Amino acid sequence: MEILRIEPTPSPNTMKVVLSYTREDKLSNTYKKVEETQPRFINQLLSIDGITSIFHVMNFLAVDKAPKADWEVILPDIKAAFSDANKVLESVNEPQIDNHFGEIKAELLTFKGIPYQIKLTSADQELREQLPQTYVDHMTQAQTAHDNIVFMRKWLDLGNRYGNIQEVMDGVLEEVLATYPESQLPVLVKHALEENHATNNYHFYRHVSLDEYHATDNWKTRLRMLNHFPKPTFEDIPLLDLALSDEKVPVRRQAIVLLGMIESKEILPYLYKGLRDKSPAVRRTAGDCISDLGYPEALPEMVLLLDDPQKIVRWRAAMFIFDEGNAEQLPALKAHINDNAFEVKLQIEMAISRIENGDEALGSVWKQMANRTI
């Protein structure tokens, strides 16, 4: 049995080890401590300092490490364990790409458009929080005897967030309460009880002018305006540019999200403002928008992010260079080859390898999918 390759996963604490051997029993096992009844190679891996558990299914292992353990120390020990036991090859093939490093997916559970629970999901963790009791009470008021609650409730995608999951939850809760103020709940209940309310796609979309937005003193109202904003056009850029200077992070982040919907090179200077924002969440969101748009003209700005203090931002920069970069970015990549975050270092190495091997820059996964439909 040999190691064919080692691949990063969306979780920074998990690596996928692909083997040359496929289990014939089609079963799966999770191992957390050394036991005599277990395969010898599993016990060897569990004996490595820093490894906390191993999941074995089909032809791969999912190896989990302690949060403070270092993959750069652990991976050579994993290879050595297989080499000692099976005399396998020392080399490991090029890792595959993790397109979602550091992301926390935020969702809002609603019933007939009335929100009552938040769910956050990262690669290795899920966190839920119920909204204040008044939201649950109004959701209950919206129910009728004929409603199928399980069928009619919906998870609304609130987009991705970045950072500590509990801090993200606190921020998302603040955003949701601003977007759906208690004063609006009776209106939502009234709408929910209307006879023709057969679908559960209720959402307010309302365009606001620059003057109306500028005249609003309450940041929660400004955020609500942006959250209920229809797909923006070029005429909305002055309003969104103003929102980029807002004192509140959720407002600036939502402005970036809306700017990213204007699929044109003309919005790049505004996204660059997001790259320089003091909040790493806004910087990463701006980087994600630029990556989705896939304009190589953004490469000089993204190269600068290789020096960002936050690894989730540096990783996005390295990923964009992998997707869109060329030989011009090699000096910058090599200057950052020893990044102290393993995930970033790995992505930089992959970008260098692709460029030096002369492989074509295919763009982001989103861009590749879009190109296939043309």
Curated annotation (Swiss-Prot):
It holds the Pfam family HEAT_2. The keyword Plastid does not apply. Transmembrane segments: none annotated. Keywords: Virulence. SUPFAM superfamilies: ARM repeat, Hypothetical protein SAV1430. InterPro entries: ARM-like, ARM-type_fold, Nfu/NifU_N, Nfu/NifU_N_sf, PBS_lyase_HEAT, Virulence_F_dom. It comes from the Bacteria. GO terms for molecular function: oxidoreductase activity. Required for hemolysin production. Contributes to virulence in both silkworm-infection model and mice. Belongs to the CvfC family. This is Conserved virulence factor C. It comes from Staphylococcus aureus (strain NCTC 8325 / PS 47).
